[in-house]
Amino acid sequence: MMVEKVVGNITTLEKRVPHIERVYMRSDDLVKRVKRVVTDHGKEIGIRLKEHQELQDGDILYMDDHNMIVISVLEDDVLTIKPTSMQQMGEIAHQLGNRHLPAQFEGNEMIVQYDYLVEELLQKLSIPFTRENRKMKQAFRPIGHRHE
């Protein structure tokens, strides 16, 4: 089976179908336009998105009256940073920016992929954080840069 567009997302779907197959993906695979995956029922699927579109957790790749195939994003090993002041937020944002490390934000939390050097830096700066496995809504995107 070849999929060229996303049908919808399960979170906004009004009509439920009786059977759901899942495709488990790492968050960094969500940005790849072309990929081959296998459902939890062993069905092989090719994904070739025509439009430049990033996949998301819950996206429906296929649906009929009896079955749907849905993307489920695997949890990432992340550091959830919880600065207690603007000073701490500024310090860690500056440090992570210098490393060109992609970050995501949810509420008052800054989330980065786990890196032992970042963990050591957070401990050194006494900035509160936790290491956890967390399902991310989108991929951590590499940050392009150049210095002149």
Swiss-Prot record:
Which keywords does this Swiss-Prot/TrEMBL entry list? Chaperone, Cytoplasm, Nickel, Nickel insertion
In the record, what terms sit under GO molecular function? nickel cation binding; unfolded protein binding
GO cellular component terms, alphabetically, are: cytoplasm
Pfam families hit by this protein: UreE_C, UreE_N
Q: Which SUPFAM superfamilies would you find in this protein's record?
A: Urease metallochaperone UreE, C-terminal domain, Urease metallochaperone UreE, N-terminal domain
Keyword Iron-sulfur on entry: no
State the Gene Ontology BP annotations. protein folding; protein-containing complex assembly; urea metabolic process
Transmembrane stretches in the record are none
**Any keyword Chaperone?**
yes
Superkingdom to which the source organism belongs: Bacteria
- Gene3D superfamilies hit by this protein: Urease metallochaperone UreE, N-terminal domain (2.60.260.20), UreE, C-terminal domain (3.30.70.790)
Q: Where in the cell is it found?
A: Cytoplasm
List the InterPro entries hit by this protein, alphabetically.
UreE, UreE_C_dom, UreE_N, UreE_N_sf
Return the similarity comment: Belongs to the UreE family.
Q: What does this protein do?
A: Involved in urease metallocenter assembly. Binds nickel. Probably functions as a nickel donor during metallocenter assembly.
What name is this protein filed under?
Urease accessory protein UreE
